[in-house]
């Protein structure tokens, strides 16, 4: 903890948050007031959000694809092709709703979306960000927990109940919401051959999701159906809901060599070297018949006409994810250290080492937090009991070999931290 001198008559305070000059990095003076760097950052965030809201509400409430993609860029690093496909699909979906409100002889069909990409590539974050910038209700479901109605597990109608709860039981808002179903590859048909055993968590779930995705009036029990059988049901129309499904389709990796050989027989290296570049190129070329071979039924594939592929995140993208987005992990931990009056600094080679560890673990962006937690655990344990520390520096040796970080004290003295017992 930094050594703070006692309050005196000369101590200055922020006029907005009340923090003293010793608790913040900078205190900017005005004619009769002071403002700290934290309040300045908060004001900038408010201005940015208002600017984004203004963009989203242009053109009668339907943002253009470029506007949607621009906002996604602030939260999601890379994945340009997927963001472009999503932006166009979402723009067309909500333009379709505005079109449906007018009298017309032409009825535009709904285009639900399938996101294909490895773990930690940003599928869930993209769906969450879309719902946030469009200001529509959002819910997320795990396909592995779903079963047909009447069997142990979660009924598909519970997805609509969660969306309704997200909309504070406003049925009209819920009917324009976004539903994200994760792990959709886990409900593939177990076998091509008929079986006397009913597939209640595979093909059965696909069949149950069909009507919801194409549009039906679902009877939703507001308190859950199994524990309160006597309650009144709410009628929710799913016709205007946008369904986004995501899956890693990990078992495809073994068959990608055969797919690559069929589609690029002249390139032997493509069949042999399963690099992230090759994998991404194959994912970009996935066709509905590939999904059929994987185990999704034709009717289900037909409800997902828009297919967007996400690539594996490389080292450069992971470094940007660590430091660039608004809620970047480095910024989050930096704020925790600021609460102790200490500045947290990561060197460039430390960020590169963290990104390499995430790639080796094959966890993508999802694994970055656990890596940072293991690196900073000892420091966060010791720091509250230390005096005079102004800065903690994490270098490559700390990130790779779990060495002790460098502590910078008030008079410019730097030394490695002592190993805690």
UniProtKB/Swiss-Prot annotation:
<dbReference type="Pfam" id="PF07724">
    <property type="entry name" value="AAA_2"/>
</dbReference>
<feature type="binding site">
    <location>
        <position position="39"/>
    </location>
    <ligand>
        <name>Zn(2+)</name>
    </ligand>
</feature>
<comment type="function">
    <text>ATP-dependent specificity component of the Clp protease. It directs the protease to specific substrates. Can perform chaperone functions in the absence of ClpP.</text>
</comment>
<comment type="similarity">
    <text>Belongs to the ClpX chaperone family.</text>
</comment>
<dbReference type="GO" id="GO:0016887">
    <property type="term" value="F:ATP hydrolysis activity"/>
</dbReference>
<dbReference type="GO" id="GO:0051082">
    <property type="term" value="F:unfolded protein binding"/>
</dbReference>
<keyword id="KW-0547">Nucleotide-binding</keyword>
<comment type="subunit">
    <text>Component of the ClpX-ClpP complex. Forms a hexameric ring that, in the presence of ATP, binds to fourteen ClpP subunits assembled into a disk-like structure with a central cavity, resembling the structure of eukaryotic proteasomes.</text>
</comment>
<dbReference type="GO" id="GO:0140662">
    <property type="term" value="F:ATP-dependent protein folding chaperone"/>
</dbReference>
<dbReference type="InterPro" id="IPR003959">
    <property type="entry name" value="ATPase_AAA_core"/>
</dbReference>
<dbReference type="InterPro" id="IPR050052">
    <property type="entry name" value="ATP-dep_Clp_protease_ClpX"/>
</dbReference>
<dbReference type="Pfam" id="PF10431">
    <property type="entry name" value="ClpB_D2-small"/>
</dbReference>
<dbReference type="Pfam" id="PF06689">
    <property type="entry name" value="zf-C4_ClpX"/>
</dbReference>
<keyword id="KW-0143">Chaperone</keyword>
<dbReference type="InterPro" id="IPR010603">
    <property type="entry name" value="Znf_CppX_C4"/>
</dbReference>
<keyword id="KW-0479">Metal-binding</keyword>
<dbReference type="InterPro" id="IPR027417">
    <property type="entry name" value="P-loop_NTPase"/>
</dbReference>
<dbReference type="InterPro" id="IPR004487">
    <property type="entry name" value="Clp_protease_ATP-bd_su_ClpX"/>
</dbReference>
<keyword id="KW-0862">Zinc</keyword>
<dbReference type="GO" id="GO:0051603">
    <property type="term" value="P:proteolysis involved in protein catabolic process"/>
</dbReference>
<feature type="binding site">
    <location>
        <position position="36"/>
    </location>
    <ligand>
        <name>Zn(2+)</name>
    </ligand>
</feature>
<dbReference type="InterPro" id="IPR038366">
    <property type="entry name" value="Znf_CppX_C4_sf"/>
</dbReference>
<dbReference type="InterPro" id="IPR046425">
    <property type="entry name" value="ClpX_bact"/>
</dbReference>
<feature type="binding site">
    <location>
        <position position="17"/>
    </location>
    <ligand>
        <name>Zn(2+)</name>
    </ligand>
</feature>
<keyword id="KW-0067">ATP-binding</keyword>
<protein>
    <recommendedName>
        <fullName>ATP-dependent Clp protease ATP-binding subunit ClpX</fullName>
    </recommendedName>
</protein>
<dbReference type="GO" id="GO:0046983">
    <property type="term" value="F:protein dimerization activity"/>
</dbReference>
<dbReference type="InterPro" id="IPR019489">
    <property type="entry name" value="Clp_ATPase_C"/>
</dbReference>
<dbReference type="GO" id="GO:0008270">
    <property type="term" value="F:zinc ion binding"/>
</dbReference>
<dbReference type="GO" id="GO:0005524">
    <property type="term" value="F:ATP binding"/>
</dbReference>
<dbReference type="GO" id="GO:0051301">
    <property type="term" value="P:cell division"/>
</dbReference>
<feature type="binding site">
    <location>
        <position position="14"/>
    </location>
    <ligand>
        <name>Zn(2+)</name>
    </ligand>
</feature>
<feature type="domain" description="ClpX-type ZB">
    <location>
        <begin position="2"/>
        <end position="55"/>
    </location>
</feature>
<feature type="binding site">
    <location>
        <begin position="118"/>
        <end position="125"/>
    </location>
    <ligand>
        <name>ATP</name>
    </ligand>
</feature>
<dbReference type="InterPro" id="IPR003593">
    <property type="entry name" value="AAA+_ATPase"/>
</dbReference>
<dbReference type="GO" id="GO:0009376">
    <property type="term" value="C:HslUV protease complex"/>
</dbReference>
């Amino acid at each position: 903890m930094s050594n703070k001198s006692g309050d005196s008559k000369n101590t200055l305070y922020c006029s907005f948050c009340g923090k003293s000059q010793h608790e913040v990095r900078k205190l900017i003076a005005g004619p009769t007031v002071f403002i700290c760097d934290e309040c300045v950052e908060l004001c900038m965030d408010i201005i940015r959000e208002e600017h984004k809201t203004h963009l989203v509400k242009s053109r009668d409430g339907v943002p253009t694809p470029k506007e949607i993609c621009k906002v996604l860029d602030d939260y999601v690093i890379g994945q340009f092709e997927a963001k472009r496909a999503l932006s166009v699909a979402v723009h067309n979906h909500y333009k379709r709703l505005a079109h449906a409100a007018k009298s017309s002889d032409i009825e535009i069909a709904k285009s639900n979306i399938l996101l294909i990409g490895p773990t930690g590539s940003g599928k869930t974050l993209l769906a969450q960000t879309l719902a946030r910038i469009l200001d529509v209700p959002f819910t997320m479901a795990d396909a592995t927990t779903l079963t047909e109605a009447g069997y142990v597990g979660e009924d598909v109608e519970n997805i609509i109940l969660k969306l309704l709860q997200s909309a504070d039981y406003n049925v009209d808002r819920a009917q324009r919401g976004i539903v994200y179903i994760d792990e959709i590859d886990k409900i593939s048909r177990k076998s091509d051959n008929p079986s006397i055993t009913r597939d209640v968590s595979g093909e059965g779930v696909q069949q149950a999701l069909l009507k919801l995705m194409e549009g039906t009036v679902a009877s939703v029990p507001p308190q859950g159906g199994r524990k309160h059988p006597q309650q009144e049901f709410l009628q929710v129309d799913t016709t205007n809901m946008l369904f986004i499904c995501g899956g890693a389709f990990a078992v495809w990796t073994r068959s990608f060599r055969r797919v690559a050989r069929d589609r690029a027989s002249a390139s032997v290296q493509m069949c042999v070297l399963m690099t992230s570049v090759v994998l991404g190129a194959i994912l970009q070329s996935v066709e509905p018949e590939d999904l059929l071979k994987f185990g999704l039924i034709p009717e289900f594939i037909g409800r997902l006409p828009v297919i967007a592929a996400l690539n594996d995140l490389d080292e450069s993208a992971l470094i940007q994810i660590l430091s660039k987005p608004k809620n970047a992990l480095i910024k989050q931990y930096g704020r925790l250290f600021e609460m102790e009056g200490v500045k947290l600094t990561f060197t460039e080679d430390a960020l590169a080492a963290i990104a390499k560890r995430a790639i080796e673990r094959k966890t993508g962006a999802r694994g970055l937090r656990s890596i940072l937690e293991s690196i900073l655990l000892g420091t966060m344990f010791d720091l509250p009991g230390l005096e005079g520390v102004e800065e903690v520096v994490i270098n490559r040796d700390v990130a790779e070999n779990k060495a002790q970080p460098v502590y910078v004290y008030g008079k410019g003295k730097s030394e490695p931290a002592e190993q805690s017992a």
